[in-house]
């Protein structure tokens, strides 16, 4: 079984065999085993702590459509298939299922889930067609573990390790987009960003930090990171008014 996996906070903080977590706070790096730091955001999803060995067992279960490596069925095949179905748009080419993101790598279907907290960056993915699972666990915050996982999968599949980045035609925000999108947005986890109109375009700050936002499609912008892109997509009501925005994998309600 997955003997080193649990949903505790204090247990891991007291475990000398648990990873030391490295996080950047107010410009200073800290190193500790504070597994409760900002951990309240995980309560809805269980807050699983695990190891590489246990997560590989987890990957085997998905690759076997619900059957563990020892032959025991953990969940029904139907349940795994329902988790993998694309249901909610996240960004171009990537959708959420139930607890899993789904995307294409070439003509291959890939399913994954990532996570981050102070001192933690993680990504879990698997590709049934290639019969491979990839787990990247890092005890440092804000590491591009998804890009590492994608590069590893590409290498395994014999593809170019570094994916070609999407190039968008130059586009300007319309007057309606500028008016509707401008404002402050706060997620339920405490992250926030602001959009202000400056010189005929939108200026963005994420948690107070200036962030370059490019208009790419109607009601959609993109932030180009070093190894990946984050899309911002307006969420509008039936009258066309923006009441929230999807940024990355989170929905940020717009403050009134």
Predicted regions and their residues:
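Short, well-ordered beta-strand elements
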Residues: 123-140, 242-246
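Short acidic (Asp/Glu) and glycine-rich catalytic loops that position anionic groups and cofactors
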Residues: 36-38, 128-132, 161-162
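Structural motif
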Residues: 105, 127-129, 198
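A structural signal for short hydrophobic beta-strand segments in well-ordered beta-sheet cores
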Residues: 22, 100-102, 124-126, 194-195, ...
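Short, surface-exposed loop or secondary-structure junction motifs
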Residues: 1-118, 122
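Peripheral terminal and inter-domain segments
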Residues: 108, 146-256
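Extended, alpha-helix-rich binding/interface surfaces that flank or overlap catalytic cores
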Residues: 143
């Amino acid at each position: 079984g997955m003997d080193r996996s649990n949903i505790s906070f204090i247990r891991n903080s007291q475990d000398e065999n648990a990873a030391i977590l490295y996080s950047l706070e107010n410009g200073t790096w800290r190193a500790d085993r504070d597994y409760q730091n900002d951990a309240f955001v995980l309560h809805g999803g269980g807050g699983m702590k695990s190891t590489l060995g246990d997560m590989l067992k987890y990957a085997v279960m998905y690759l076997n459509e619900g059957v563990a490596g020892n032959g025991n069925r953990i969940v029904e095949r139907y349940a795994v298939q329902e988790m993998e179905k694309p249901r909610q748009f996240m960004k171009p080419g990537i959708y959420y299922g139930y607890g899993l993101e789904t995307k294409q790598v070439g003509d291959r279907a890939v399913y994954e889930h990532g996570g981050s907290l102070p001192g933690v960056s993680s990504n879990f993915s698997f590709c049934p067609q290639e019969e491979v699972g990839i787990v990247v666990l890092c005890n440092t915050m804000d590491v591009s573990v998804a890009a590492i996982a994608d590069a590893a999968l590409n290498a395994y599949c014999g593809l170019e390790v570094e994916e070609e980045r999407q190039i968008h035609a130059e586009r300007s925000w319309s007057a309606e987009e500028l008016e509707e999108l401008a404002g402050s947005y706060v997620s339920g986890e405490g992250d926030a960003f602001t959009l202000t109109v400056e010189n005929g375009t939108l200026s963005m700050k994420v948690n107070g930090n200036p962030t370059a936002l490019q208009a790419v499609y109607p009601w959609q912008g993109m932030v180009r990171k070093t190894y990946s892109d984050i899309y911002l997509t307006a969420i509008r009501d039936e009258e066309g008014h923006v009441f929230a925005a999807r940024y990355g994998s989170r929905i940020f309600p717009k403050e009134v």
